[in-house]
């Protein structure tokens, strides 16, 4: 009887695990304007042209851009979105966004939802208040955001996020994404040329990376007691802790219910956004943890890491916690690195 009972319990557990996996499979990437979403919302001919743009770097004709923008708007509104934003990465260390509603007036008291190709492809935020790395004078305000079709748009908090580059009127990079894409292009040209000389019939190479995000979690009430943490995100003074990271007993230790619940919510939010959140565990220092994704193309991995850091900090407040992403928030214990296994492949 005992053997039969154990077999039944094992089978039941496997079925429960399978059901959970199917649920994740069903909602993974549900908030991303993925290729499957494009197939549903775009005419077949336009979808094929979009694939050429994304995979081969071809230009997108204006008339096609209008169709893509309208389809993207319809998909986002079906997800409950009311606004869109050009999401970019200026030289501030964080992302930037300006939200515009889809509505356009058609009369004194009426509006229509509209989103056109020119609004998808280009935006004009005021660049005078963003750092330029000394490229130009501070009074020069002109700056442009340009759609990056290789990184998929997504919906978050009722807003359609469109990944974009940020540059000046003469093409000078005012962000972190533009140099990254240019370096990828330079590496692609050089590597393809070398491989062709060596006899390999290669037409394109891409770089991949999987940044491991380390972070600290501390109680929100304790966080509020420290002005230095509130202002700078790190401690500036204080005594050494009673116990540090001696014996490394925190590393890979069992997770508390509070932290586990936090990690589960983080996973769910990231999976909805198509982020391959894979591995999570306790790190060496007390209260330090790590979230590692499956590697993907460098450009997408960079965008997803920005999302990961944002989600880690926002979800922490739901559990009475504060997430510290500073590289060295505490003296005498490990800081938070960001290991990334960079490579390139054909």
Predicted regions and their residues:
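Extracytoplasmic glycan-interaction modules
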Residues: 9-10, 203
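Active-site core of metal-dependent hydrolases
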Residues: 10, 27-140
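Extracytoplasmic/secretory-pathway proteins
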Residues: 13-14
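Flexible inter-domain linker/hinge segments
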Residues: 18, 23, 27-32, 185, ...
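A short alpha-helix capping/helix-coil boundary motif
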Residues: 26-30, 49-53, 244-247, 289-293
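Glycine-rich, acidic/polar active-site loops that bind/position phosphate-bearing ligands
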Residues: 141-325, 330-346
């Amino acid at each position: 009887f005992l053997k039969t009972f154990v077999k039944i319990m094992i089978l039941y557990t496997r079925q429960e695990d399978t059901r959970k996996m199917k649920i994740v499979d069903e909602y993974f990437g549900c908030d991303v304007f993925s290729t499957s979403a494009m197939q549903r919302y775009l005419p077949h001919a336009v979808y094929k042209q979009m694939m050429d743009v994304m995979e081969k770097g071809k230009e997108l004709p204006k008339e096609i851009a209008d169709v893509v923008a309208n389809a993207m708007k319809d998909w986002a509104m079906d997800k409950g979105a009311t606004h869109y934003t050009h999401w970019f990465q200026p030289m501030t260390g964080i992302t930037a966004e300006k939200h515009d509603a889809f509505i356009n007036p058609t009369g004194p008291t009426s509006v229509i939802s509209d989103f056109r190709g020119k609004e998808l492809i280009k935006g004009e935020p005021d660049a005078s208040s963003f750092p330029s790395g000394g490229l130009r004078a501070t009074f020069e305000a002109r700056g442009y955001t340009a759609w990056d079709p290789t990184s998929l748009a997504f919906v978050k908090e009722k807003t359609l996020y469109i990944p974009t580059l940020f540059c000046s009127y003469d093409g000078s990079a005012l962000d972190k994404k533009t140099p990254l894409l240019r370096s990828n292009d330079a590496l692609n040209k050089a590597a393809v040329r070398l491989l062709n000389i060596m006899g390999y019939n290669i037409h394109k190479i891409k770089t991949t990376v999987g940044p491991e995000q380390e972070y600290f979690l501390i109680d929100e009430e304790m966080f509020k007691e420290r002005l230095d943490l509130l202002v700078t995100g790190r401690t500036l003074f204080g005594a050494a802790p009673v116990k540090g990271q001696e014996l490394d007993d925190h590393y890979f230790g069992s997770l508390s219910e509070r932290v586990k619940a936090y990690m589960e919510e983080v996973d769910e939010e990231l999976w909805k956004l198509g982020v391959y959140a894979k591995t999570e565990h306790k790190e060496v220092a007390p209260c330090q943890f790590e979230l590692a994704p499956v590697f993907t193309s460098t450009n997408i991995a960079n965008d997803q890491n920005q999302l990961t850091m944002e989600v880690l900090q926002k979800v922490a407040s739901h559990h009475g916690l504060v997430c510290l992403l500073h590289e060295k928030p505490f003296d005498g214990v490990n800081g938070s690195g960001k290991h990334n296994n960079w490579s390139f492949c054909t």
